[in-house]
Amino acid sequence: MKTIKLAPGERLVTNQLNRKGVLPQNIVDAARDIVANVRANGDAAVRDCCQRFDGVELQSFRLPQEQIDAALEGLDPAFVAALEKAARQIREFHQREVEQSWFTTRPDGTILGVKVTPLAAAGIYVPGGTAAYPSSVIMNAVPAMVAGVPRIVMAAPASRDGRMNPYVLATARKIGITEIYKMGGAQACLLYTSPSPRDG
């Protein structure tokens, strides 16, 4: 094992990195209530959360494919170029991390090895609010794509008019995400762990 000695200043950084985050109890309780409500009441609870927290009434959670396909129309070419560059660089970085399957046969016929298999699906969450986070789309989705995950699902909150942030949506379209849900918060994260919601 390699031993690395840290200077006193570096130790302060290490202590910060190793610090366990503690959420305030009221936040934990609120998230727990949302989870219990969605598990018990499904889509109705998700709609209620979207209305309470995001101020939007949604009839359908899943974004229609035609809206995804049209996401790049009218965007500043400089933004699209920057997006393509960022996605390319992040892809190149994560390609170096990809583990390969390997097998070997011993003289006695025993086969040894490691089979690396991607997950069947990955869910990513892109925060909303007053700012747009297209970088969150790339940073979360591209590693899964490089790993060979065949299905990537994205959730992001809609604005009060029911629309998604155009930059976030365009980024998802550009890198190839085709399954997108308009919802935020803890209720959105439940999308990845339960059959609700699955509307078209």
Which sequence ranges carry the predicted segments?
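Single conserved hydrophobic/aromatic residue that forms the stacking wall/gate
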Residues: Y192-G200
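Active-site-adjacent beta-strand anchor residues
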Residues: R39, A155, K182-M183
